[in-house]
């Protein structure tokens, strides 16, 4: 399996990713193949517009029941709404993954120039 070079986020979340405020994302197994130490391009899900680049720090298993306030804060959504959204996106899936990342240094410079 090849190493992913892109990741998408809902457009409403991309300002948080691009500012470095959002540093995790919760995905299912099909989207868990990111590799720590790699850099990936961030695109909006809706329009495929490139937003920035992030460096993958970790990919760790996460059970649905382990989703907590920290995850909700990172997703900029209340915990009950986050759990409902995850169930909508990944119905009947308990085995999830939390991908931890940071804004790539070159991305922050480019964003400040805009």
Curated annotation (Swiss-Prot):
Gene Ontology cellular component annotations, sorted alphabetically: cytosol
Active site residues per record: 22 (proton acceptor), 25 (nucleophile), 75 (proton donor)
Enzyme class label: hydrolase
All copies of domain ASCH, residue ranges: 8-93
Record's catalysed reaction(s): N(4)-acetylcytidine + H2O = cytidine + acetate + H(+); N(4)-acetyl-2'-deoxycytidine + H2O = 2'-deoxycytidine + acetate + H(+); N(4)-acetylcytosine + H2O = cytosine + acetate + H(+)
MF term (GO), any: hydrolase activity, acting on carbon-nitrogen (but not peptide) bonds, in linear amidines
Keywords: Hydrolase
Top-level taxonomic group: Bacteria
A Pfam family annotated for this UniProt entry: ASCH
Record-listed E.C. numbers: 3.5.1.135
Annotated family: Belongs to the N(4)-acetylcytidine amidohydrolase family.
Protein purpose: Catalyzes the hydrolysis of N(4)-acetylcytidine (ac4C).
HAMAP family: ac4C_amidohydr (MF_00684)
NCBIfam families on file: PRK04980.1
Protein name, UniProt field: N(4)-acetylcytidine amidohydrolase
């Amino acid at each position: 399996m090849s190493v992913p070079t892109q990741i998408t986020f809902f457009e409403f979340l991309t300002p948080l990713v691009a500012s470095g405020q959002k540093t995790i994302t919760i995905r299912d197994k099909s989207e868990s193949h990111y590799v720590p130490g790699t850099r990936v391009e961030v695109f909006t899900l809706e329009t495929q517009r490139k937003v920035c680049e992030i460096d993958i720090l970790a990919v760790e298993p996460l059970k649905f029941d382990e989703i907590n306030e920290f995850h909700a804060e990172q997703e900029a959504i209340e915990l009950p709404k986050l759990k409902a959204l995850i169930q909508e996106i990944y119905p009947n899936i308990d085995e999830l993954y939390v991908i931890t990342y940071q804004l790539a240094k070159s991305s922050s410079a480019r964003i400040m120039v805009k």
